[in-house]
C-alpha cells in the first residue's frame, strides 16, 4: 500500500511500546529497529484465514513468529520510505528476488547485526528467524511461511497512520473485508 504521493509504503508492527503511538508521530525508537510486515499482506492473509480463529493473540504470535507468551498488545500501521526499509535476510534489498546463502553477506555492520541476531534468535530467545525475509508461522498449519518481514533500522523517518489494540485491529480487519 503506497501513500498518495507514491513515495512511502504502509507497514505494520505488533508491539508493546509504552508510548501511545499517536497518528502523525514517529514510531518510538526505544525498542531498537522495527520489525514489520506489509499491511496489505496482513489484510489478504486475514481474508483467507480468519475463519475458526478463537485466540487472536496466539494466532498472530504464531503467524508473526514470536513467542505465544509475549506481551504484544497493539498493532501500529506506519508510513515509511522504501529506502529506509531492508529485508532482515541474507539479501537486504526488499525489492530483489531472495537468494539463500550466508556467503552473500558482506563484512560490515549489517553482517555483524545478522550474526548477533542468529545467536540471539536461536540460543538466547524463543524468536524463530528464517533469515529468508518471511516470518516463521509455528501454528502447525499447511505451511511454515508466515508473512514477508521487513526491518526499519531507524524509526526517525516513520509516520504513524494508526494504532489499535489487538482486538480492535481484528475488528478493523473484519470491517475491511466487509467493505471489499
Question: What are the functions of these language-model segments?
Answer:
Residues 1-36:
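ADP-ribose/NAD+-binding catalytic cleft of ART/PARP-like enzymes
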Residues 15, 49-50, 78:
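Histidine (H) residue identity feature
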Residues 17, 41-42, 83-86:
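Solvent-exposed loop/turn segments at secondary-structure junctions
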Residues 24-26, 49-52, 90-93:
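Surface-exposed beta-strand edges and their flanking turn/coil or helix-capping segments
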Residues 35-39, 79-81:
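Short His-Asn-centered micro-motif
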Residues 36, 54-57, 144, 163:
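Low-complexity, intrinsically disordered regions enriched in charged/polar residues
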Residues 39-57, 61:
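Short active-site loop/helix that positions an aromatic residue
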Residues 61-180:
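Conserved NAD+-utilizing ADP-ribose enzyme module
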Amino acid at each position: 500500500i503506497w501513500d498518495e504521493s507514491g513515495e512511502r509504503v504502509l507497514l505494520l508492527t505488533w508491539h508493546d511500546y509504552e508510548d501511545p503511538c499517536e497518528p502523525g508521530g514517529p514510531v518510538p525508537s526505544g525498542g531498537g529497529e522495527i520489525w514489520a510486515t506489509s499491511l496489505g499482506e496482513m489484510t489478504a492473509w486475514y481474508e483467507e484465514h480468519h475463519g475458526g480463529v478463537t485466540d487472536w493473540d496466539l494466532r498472530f504470535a504464531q503467524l508473526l513468529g514470536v513467542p505465544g507468551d509475549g506481551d504484544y498488545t497493539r498493532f501500529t500501521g506506519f508510513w515509511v520510505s522504501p529506502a529506509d526499509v531492508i529485508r532482515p535476510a541474507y539479501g537486504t534489498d526488499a525489492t530483489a528476488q531472495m537468494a539463500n546463502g550466508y556467503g552473500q553477506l558482506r563484512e560490515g555492520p549489517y553482517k555483524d547485526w545478522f550474526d548477533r541476531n542468529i545467536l540471539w534468535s536461536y540460543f538466547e530467545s524463543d524468536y524463530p528467524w528464517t533469515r529468508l525475509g518471511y516470518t516463521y508461522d509455528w501454528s502447525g498449519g499447511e505451511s511454515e511461511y508466515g508473512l514477508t518481514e521487513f526491518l526499519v533500522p531507524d524509526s526517525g523517518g516513520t509516520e504513524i497512520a494508526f494504532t489499535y489494540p489487538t482486538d480492535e485491529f481484528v475488528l478493523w480487519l473484519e470491517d475491511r473485508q466487509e467493505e471489499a
